[in-house]
């Protein structure tokens, strides 16, 4: 009986590990599908992902995080952030504020959900994040550089829309330290765009918009920057 009990526990453990590994594998696939669908603005595909991931959202924190990302991705593309349930917003805020360290997962959540924070909370979180990662920027992983760039660009957009006058040197400094490689080109261009917006340099603003449009990036302008920011 003792051996039988140990065997059953062992088999149960194996089954649990297989289930966890299967879920982890699905999570990786879903992440790639989410990134691709969001970049190409495929709302219908995102809706399908929301249903699919929603079946597993209570099985692990990582799965819930991904589910939240899908929910906010859809709302962002539809311009319907205000229609996200308060329960989801509350859980997302709790994830961010309860985090002991700025992991990639937490940063991803924050990057996509920045619009739900009060300005003073957003400023506090931004300050904490960029002071944590401002050193050795070029040595950060490519994935982390992309997430941090997204946070920087979203923050600049939020500050501009809110017409707030605050010190943004921490953001500009981080972007300037990113390696000069194709992956970081968009972040550097858009950071310059907002810098010109804040400085009222309308001619430079128009030049960047025209450059992006003439190089097949009109869809990025539509969803990721505030156009016509003439002061």
Region locations from a protein language model:
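Short, charged recognition helix plus adjacent turn
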Residues: 12-41
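DNA major-groove recognition helix of helix-turn-helix/homeodomain DNA-binding modules
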Residues: 1-9
């Amino acid at each position: 009986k003792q051996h039988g009990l140990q065997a059953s526990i062992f088999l149960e453990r194996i089954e649990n590990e297989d289930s966890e590994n299967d879920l982890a594998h699905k999570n990786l696939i879903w992440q790639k599908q989410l990134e691709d669908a969001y970049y190409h603005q495929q709302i219908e595909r995102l809706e399908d992902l929301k249903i699919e991931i929603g079946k597993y959202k209570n099985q692990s924190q990582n799965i819930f995080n991904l589910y939240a990302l899908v929910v906010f991705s859809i709302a962002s593309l539809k311009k319907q952030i205000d229609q996200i349930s308060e329960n989801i917003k509350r859980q997302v805020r709790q994830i961010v504020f309860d985090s002991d360290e700025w992991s990639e997962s937490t940063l991803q959540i924050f990057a996509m959900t920045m619009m739900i924070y009060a300005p003073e909370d957003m400023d506090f979180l931004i300050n904490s994040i960029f002071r944590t990662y401002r050193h050795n920027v070029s040595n950060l992983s490519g994935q982390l550089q992309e997430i941090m760039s997204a946070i920087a660009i979203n923050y600049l957009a939020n500050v501009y829309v809110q017409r707030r006058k605050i010190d943004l040197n921490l953001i500009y400094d981080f972007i300037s330290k990113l390696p000069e490689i194709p992956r970081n080109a968009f972040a550097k261009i858009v950071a310059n765009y907002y810098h010109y917006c804040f400085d009222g340099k309308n001619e430079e603003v128009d030049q960047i918009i025209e450059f992006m449009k003439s190089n097949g990036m009109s869809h990025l302008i539509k969803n990721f920057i505030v156009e016509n920011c003439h002061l």
